[in-house]
């Protein structure tokens, strides 16, 4: 059986640094098509050898006219492989074929857009054009299109929001179809490109590698057992690294700016004597849970809220002291207890408390005092790359605040974080 890394019928995503690359990869896999994220500077020879069915160019934080901006090898366009270019990728494609890109009025967040009938939109736009809403995140604009391309989308601020060259099977979108919670038509656009234009068969399922993973784990356990039987020296280090950890940590060769530095990616010394085992490294969180269910793990384990590998230390903002951690543990326990009491714990994706080393004035027992601040954070998300703050009932928040302030003397104030991701991240550090 082939490993996931050499899976056939693959879509490649060339990463130019977009923080939505993780989301994009996951949306393609949700279409039951295997995809991999690769650095933008991958060689043409490697692409020829791997023979992907399609290529997606991600967005990125750069401008195509910057001196050190990442650029695609023009020979890639000559491979005859369908290409969907998103945001920065579209600007790059337009420029590479003779179009122009210039700074313009920025568009961020929800944006009304006009979609025109075309091959990419054929399942959402019939004979007439369609007005809908999409997710934008750009400042630069394609100002003139290359010869052989047509405009397929426009907004009030960006007249060229989508382009296509059906003869060469090249498509560009200034918006982000992968952010499906804010782009209702995005999944259908990706489905059309992946399954119809690229003719990718819907064969991918994380359960297909279950037998292979179990076999490898069994072999590893036997090998470790044999070695331990001969010596008490430790030989192995097992890590629960998943694919989102790898992508978010912006590994070498990728253009992505580091947003999260995961403790289990790139942090091990090169001369490490232990042998590293990472059986889940190329699976997303949801795919790991699917495997867990197939392996018979309990829902108590599979549905627990994520907890950071470094522990509570990243939820103490600033200097980390034992007394700060003690306060945070008590506050977090109260918060989770109240959520479970209100039967809300299983309805939200993640919830936790944070310790802020900020003292503010309060009145306790007719006396003036100063105490620390506790922030409460609860989010709803399907992939943890984007998310919305959870709308908790006021009576639940009131109960949490009252208990924390009354049961933890060092705390005088409780606040609730109502920031979405993006722009905020789920964890504060």
UniProtKB/Swiss-Prot annotation:
Its EC number is 6.3.5.2. One of its GO terms (cellular component) is cytosol. Homodimer. It holds the Pfam family GATase. It comes from the Bacteria. It comes from Chlamydia pneumoniae. This is Putative GMP synthase [glutamine-hydrolyzing]. The keyword Cytoplasm does not apply.
């Amino acid at each position: 059986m082939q490993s996931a890394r050499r899976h056939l019928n693959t879509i490649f995503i060339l990463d130019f640094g977009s923080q939505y690359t993780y989301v994009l990869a996951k949306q393609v896999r949700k279409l039951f098509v295997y995809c991999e994220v690769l650095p933008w500077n991958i060689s043409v020879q490697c692409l020829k050898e791997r023979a992907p069915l399609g290529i997606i160019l991600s967005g990125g934080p750069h401008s195509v006219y910057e001196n050190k901006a990442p650029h695609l090898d023009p020979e890639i366009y000559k491979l005859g492989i369908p290409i969907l270019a998103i945001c920065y990728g579209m600007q790059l494609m337009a420029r590479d074929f003779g179009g122009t890109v210039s700074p313009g009025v920025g568009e961020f967040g929800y944006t009304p857009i006009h979609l025109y009938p075309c091959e990419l939109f054929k399942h959402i736009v019939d004979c007439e054009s369609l007005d809908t809403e999409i997710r934008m995140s750009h400042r630069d604009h394609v100002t003139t299109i290359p010869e052989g391309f047509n405009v397929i989308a426009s907004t009030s601020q960006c007249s060229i929001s989508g382009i296509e060259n059906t003869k060469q099977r090249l498509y560009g979108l200034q918006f982000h179809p992968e952010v499906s919670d804010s782009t209702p038509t995005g999944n259908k656009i990706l489905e059309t490109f992946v399954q119809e234009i690229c003719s990718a068969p819907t064969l991918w399922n994380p359960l297909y590698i279950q037998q292979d993973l179990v076999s490898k784990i069994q072999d590893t356990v036997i090998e470790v057992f044999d070695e331990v039987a001969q010596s008490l020296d430790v030989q192995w280090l097992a890590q629960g690294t998943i694919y989102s950890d790898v992508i978010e940590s912006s590994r070498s060769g990728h253009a992505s700016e580091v947003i999260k530095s995961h403790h289990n990616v790139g942090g091990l010394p090169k001369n490490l004597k232990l042998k590293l085992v990472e059986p889940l490294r190329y699976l997303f969180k949801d795919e790991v849970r699917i495997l867990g269910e197939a392996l018979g793990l309990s829902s108590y384990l599979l549905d627990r809220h994520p907890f950071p590998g470094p522990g509570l230390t990243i939820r103490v903002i600033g200097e980390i002291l034992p007394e700060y951690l003690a306060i945070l543990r008590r506050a977090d326990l109260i918060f989770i207890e109240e959520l479970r009491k209100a039967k809300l714990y299983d309805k939200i994706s993640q919830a936790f408390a944070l310790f802020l080393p900020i003292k503010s004035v309060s009145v306790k027992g007719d006396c003036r005092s100063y105490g620390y601040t506790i922030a409460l954070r609860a989010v709803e998300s399907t992939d943890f790359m984007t998310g919305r703050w959870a709308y908790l009932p006021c009576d639940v928040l009131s109960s949490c605040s009252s208990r924390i302030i009354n049961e933890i003397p060092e705390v005088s104030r409780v606040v609730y974080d109502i920031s979405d991701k993006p722009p905020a991240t789920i964890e504060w550090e």
